[in-house]
Amino acid sequence: MNNQLVPQNAAAAAAAAAAAAAAAAANSLKSRKPYTISKQRENWTDEEHQKFLEALTLFDRDWKKIESFVGSKTVIQIRSHAQKYFIKVQKNNTGERIPPPRPKRKSIQPYPQKQKHDGMGAFIPDSLSGNHFISSSSFATWMTYRGLMPNISESQINPSDLQKQLEQLQQAQQYIQQAVTTAQSSQRNGGLPPNPSSNNGGTTLTPNFPKIYAFLSNLFESNGTSFTEALSDLSMIDRETMQILMHNLAINLANQQYRDNHQTLSEQYRMKRDEDEDLNAIMISPRNSTGNINVSGDFYDNNSNNNNNNNNNNNNNNNNNNNNNNNNNNNNNNNNNNNNNNNNNNNNNNNNNNGGDFGDQNHSNMVNLGNYYNNHPNQNTINALYSLNQPSTLSNNPLNMVGNLNPQKQPPFNLNLNMQSGF
């Protein structure tokens, strides 16, 4: 009986000791500091997000480099934004590349480094060698991400083929570096770059730049046809120069400063184009030299037939009166007949002078309208309409739209009057 109680008491004592040790260990641990937001959250603009994506492709999870690349966000903000972006990509399964997480400090497996491209430094001209973005080892990865370089995995390349490609790449790098250096030195001296392959004869060949730029412009056209025939027509120096220009174009397109300048120039061009369109819209508007709207004389044209009929009636009446006067005055002296003829001629001349240069027939038509409707009930409207052709009343007329102008030189215009009965 006593032998059975001893193990039970020992087990209870051991359990009590373990509980006491756990309680002491819990009391010895420091309490975790609660999380507090020290800085207000700021929204990311589209430009900042695009910079973040490019930096993520270049530097993976190197937050310090990403911070210097973005420039407007801190490391804490970048890591928070990256965490939300990674969750969104995994949730939507959109296929964007997510860099692998960095290992712990005591991890056995090292962090996977990107494949270094040893030859990228030789492609860079001297003017861009100080740019950290272009001179970085991740430039080739960025070019591959943008589709400017083919993306080939290591499993698809044999070691022997890789060695040959590296040798060819080194030779190409050396050649291009010499060509770029020669072009820069000749540009500083004010000349054209010589042909590197023409060392035997001592003569220098200059590239045909108009032909090269014409080929490049056709190459970038959306509806361009095959360019193999045009490429075969180029000489060796033209092909080499075109390769250098295309490589410089790729470097410029990868430069952030170039993109910023391109965006600024595009905005300035759009503003200038809008200003020119507004100016053209003002100049095309139908206005005369005094700034008023110059419209055609539709009222005169619509009533021209009536005016001509009135003129014919008046002329017939005048002829009848002249005939009657001639019949009644047959017994008079020849001197009286001559005087009547002279008076008639003077009257005709006066009537012809009333027409002037004012729209040819329109002025005489308006005078006849004023005479014909002299006794019309709407006398004020007729007088105002008739006064447009009189120099003495032109400046005082309330319907005047063009100011003090010579009525004999003023073209007809439409008054758009609300004419009452009789018109």
From Swiss-Prot:
Composition bias, Polar residues? 286-295, 361-372
Q: Which GO terms describe its biological process?
A: regulation of gene expression; regulation of macropinocytosis
Where composition is biased (Low complexity), the residues are 177-202, 302-354
Name of one Pfam family that matches: RVE6
Q: Where is the HTH myb-type domain?
A: 36-90
Residues of the region (Disordered) are 93-116, 177-205, 284-372
Q: Which UniProt keywords apply?
A: DNA-binding, Nucleus, Transcription, Transcription regulation
Domain of life where this protein originates = Eukaryota
| PANTHER family xref list | DEUBIQUITINASE MYSM1, SWI/SNF COMPLEX-RELATED
Name of the molecule in the record: Myb-like protein G
Q: Which organism is it from?
A: Dictyostelium discoideum
UniProt lists the gene as mybG
